[in-house]
Amino acid sequence: MSENAKFADYVQNNIRGIGEDTAFLGMSNVWVREAIAHNYAQNFTWLGRPVIQVPQDVYAIQELIWACRPDLVIETGIAHGGSLILTASMLAMLDYCDAVEAGVVLDPKASRRKVVGVDIDIRPHNRAGIEAHPLAHKISTIQGSSVAPEVFEQVKAHAMGYDRIMVFLDSNHTHEHVLAELELYAPLTSKGSYCVVWDTGVEDLPDHMCADRPWGKGNNPRTAVREYERLLAGEGLTAADGERLMFEKDKTIEHKIVITASIDGFLRRI
């Protein structure tokens, strides 16, 4: 066994141990709850734009994009645009590495790799910040409800011709909305890639932390994921590529980062 393989095996053993340590996972969930009380995830930027993510989830995004090498990422929920910039920067890094390996000169604006962001309200100052960013050429934005038919038709038009698609769902966190998003967007996910449902951790929050929101315990992204799993197992669904649509929860990435907003939210298409 090579040294690289030995280290990879060592890491997998670490992750398995974490997954079996319910006390450690429980403490991490308490930490996340306390961090939310301090608006911790709102304190970070990515290449100059606010990114509303805990840093460990940013690591997860990096690992997933590097492993899956998507040519299109679809994101619902834009906010300040930091997540779009994060994704665009990772796609640009894939372009760079491809050019280095091929020994060719890179034209940054010639790549087909793109990220499409959807939000019901792209505020003017956020749109201006996104459009002024050097990575704006890799980003397309659509304003409107992510589950509106006319909006989803635009997303599908963007997705035409792409065969390695990744999906991030991070807009309205009610059960009804997230389930509708899953029914529309999850089938666009390419086999071997991911549909990540953010903020499933709402299910673990005390009621007072969601009192000013239309979502909360029993009505959130995790309950939507559970319902979608029942639909997949029951009636069976078809992916956009015409094949049977099946997902599995990737607990390995979750146990690797431990601190995450998305317990049971990393869905890998199989």
Kindly give the residue locations of the regions a language model identified.
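Short, mixed-charge, low-aromatic patches
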Residues: 12-22, 41-47, 138-140, 179-186
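S-adenosylmethionine/decaboxylated-SAM
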Residues: 49, 58-270
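N-terminal auxiliary segments of SAM/dcSAM-dependent transferases
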Residues: 1-28
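Short, compositionally biased "basic patch" segments
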Residues: 23-37, 121-126
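Class I SAM-dependent methyltransferase Rossmann-like catalytic core
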Residues: 29, 33-68
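Poly-acidic low-complexity segments
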Residues: 4, 21, 54, 145-148
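Residues that form generic nucleotide/phosphate-binding pockets
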Residues: 10, 14, 30, 34, ...
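Alpha-helical interaction segments
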Residues: 20-22, 34-37, 50-52, 152, ...
